[in-house]
UniProtKB/Swiss-Prot annotation:
Residues binding [2Fe-2S] cluster: 42, 47, 50, 80
GO molecular function, one term: metal ion binding
UniProt source species: Leptolyngbya boryana
Record-stated family: Belongs to the 2Fe2S plant-type ferredoxin family.
InterPro entries: 2Fe-2S_ferredoxin-like_sf, 2Fe-2S_ferredoxin-type, 2Fe2S_fd_BS, Beta-grasp_dom_sf, Fd_pln
Sequence ranges assigned to domain 2Fe-2S ferredoxin-type in this UniProt record: 4-96
Protein's recorded name: Ferredoxin-1
Cofactor(s) the protein requires to work: [2Fe-2S] cluster
Assembly with partners or alone: Forms a complex with heterodimeric ferredoxin-thioredoxin reductase (FTR) and thioredoxin.
Cofactor binding annotation: Binds 1 [2Fe-2S] cluster.
């Protein structure tokens, strides 16, 4: 099973960490298993609490039901239902920037 390097960045939170995430595990779950505290609420892709923004790489977030096409095109991702499909970099704690 392939895994990918996911870099999680948020200057305000002092976060700049790269973790290995299997391609069948949600990024939020993998981060928590490695002791990284990211925001979340529903864990089902139905709200925006866990929103991040991809600056490099790709994910599969087909389970999400909250983001519209424009937000997805802009790079927003819900980490609670996002599987990595390549090495990627995600700016975390982006909920306020969605609106």
């Amino acid at each position: 099973m392939p895994s990918f390097k996911v870099t999680l960045i948020n200057e305000t939170e002092g976060l700049n960490t790269t973790i290995e995430v299997p391609d069948d595990e949600y990024i939020l779950d993998a981060a928590e298993e490695q002791g990284i505290d990211l925001p979340y609420s529903c864990r089902a892709g139905a709200c925006s609490t866990c929103a991040g923004k991809i600056t490099a790489g790709t994910v599969d977030q087909s389970d999400q039901s909250f983001l519209d096409d424009d937000q997805i095109q802009a790079g927003y991702v819900l980490t609670c239902v996002a599987y990595p499909t390549s090495d990627c970099t995600i700016l975390t704690h982006q909920e306020e920037d969605l609106y």
